[in-house]
Amino acid sequence: GRDLGDVFSGLDRNKTVGDVVLEVKNLSSPFLKDASFQVRAGEVVGFSGLVGAGRTEVVRAIIGADPRTGGKVFLNGKPLNCRTPHDAIVNGVVMVPEDRKLQGIIPRMSVGRNISIGSLDQITNRLGFVNTRREEQIGLEGKANFNIKTPDLEKPIVELSGGNQQKAIVARWMSTKPEVLILDEPTKGIDVGAKSEFYNMICEFAKEGLAVILISS
């Protein structure tokens, strides 16, 4: 119910945004038809609508979670053809899903592992062994950078509040140094104080030059 101008008061509206990072042309899937838009560096593009309006379906088709039936996607001017969400991650397009419990956190893992798992490709050697020192470092950086309230990284993530669980998911994907960050209902089910933190966080991402897609009902 808040005015978006108040929510994103931290954004400098006089600042010129950068080049087009993500471009979608006539994208179609079994769940949508002919979606087209651009997202520039330092820009927050919002998708709003009722459930079933296609706001989540658009990004699912972009990241390879749903099959495409038509259209094209470009990342920095080059074709982006993601068959799976992993393809999107490798190319610098990451998504924080709407359903935190089913699609976001990994309940049986610790806070630290939930953060570092997004960077598993970078911290695993050719023999499949994980660099545990680097893994811990990523967890500590995520905890500090996103103000995750937990006594230690070994604590099960399910014991954290909803807001801190969500911060851990954001930390996971931001540790991969993405170019495009997709946030699907990022403040759903978290308290008012945490919501304010998230809005400020999104403003900071944009100021740093990240291309952001924000989905909200």
What are these regions (language model features)?
Residues 1-217:
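Glycine-rich phosphate-binding loops of nucleotide-dependent enzymes
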